[in-house]
Amino acid sequence: MTDMVTESLSTGDGFKKYFEILPALTEGERQAAFRIRHSVYCEDLGWEAVRADGFETDAYDAQSLHCLIRSRASGGFIGCVRLIRVAPGDSLDTLPFERTCRDTLDRSIVDPAALPRAKIAEVSRLAIVGQYRRRRGEERTPGIVQDSDFGTPDRPRFPYMLVGLYMGVFAIAELHGLEKLFLLSEPRLARHLNKIGIANQQIGEATEHRGLRAPSVMDVRQVIDNLDPLLHSVFVVVRDELKGAYRAADFTVDSRAL
């Protein structure tokens, strides 16, 4: 037990030593996320058209919560992710996955339309800049947790950047009072997330969307409460960093969370 506690503390400390998670609250920070997305989704993957301004943006950015990861060594932003929320005041607004998977969702598992709309969001546009994800086989992925990311029992390693961004997703969701998060992803991503303790449930058949993508749902409280010590230590560091950034910016979120 002592070894597990020591290891979890060193995992959180290790993350804090090399990386920082922060919410993109200013226009400059949001533009940093848009530049990362352009580098990954437009230039590297070719999933979106290259744009003259170097920003990858869409209509959902205005209603999204954006998160960045920064390298402490370089001081530069190296990854991002966003949570798309339903447009405030628009009861008819739908999240992107609801349209893409309209005909394949299994509403007997969960019906997004029946949930409190202000309490749900979609995880979207997770990206890590190329130089940080170019191990063999990763050149065409914006960021995915692989079994090999954790190394072997003899030579373990921890995928700090990816886990940090996912912990940022859940910390931001908690701070903003979100209860359910949806994800449209390759089925293997959902499997890898489950393997490392980020519980998610597939809620429909895979559909074609730049390859086969399947919708899944994650319960924010359930995931946070059931993180193993290694992930939880990173989550605590990330949540504290986000809280500090919100306070410094005098940004209003759920006061109980701060």
What are these regions (language model features)?
Residues M1-T6:
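Acidic, low-complexity proline/glycine-rich segments
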Residues E7-F55, A62, H66-R70, R85:
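Short amphipathic alpha-helix that is part of the acyltransferase structural core
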Residues D53-Y60, R188-H192:
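Beta-rich nucleic-acid/ligand-interaction surfaces
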Residues T57-D61, E205-E208:
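Short glycine-biased active-site loop of nucleotidyltransferases that positions the nucleotide triphosphate
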Residues G75-I78:
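Glycine-rich acetyl-CoA-binding "A-motif" of GNAT/NAT acetyltransferases
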Residues R82:
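Short hydrophobic beta-strand segments that form the core of ligand-binding sensory/regulatory domains
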Residues P88-M218:
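Acyl-donor binding region in acyl/amide transferases
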Residues G197-R256:
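Accessory, usually C-terminal, subdomains that scaffold auxiliary metal cofactors
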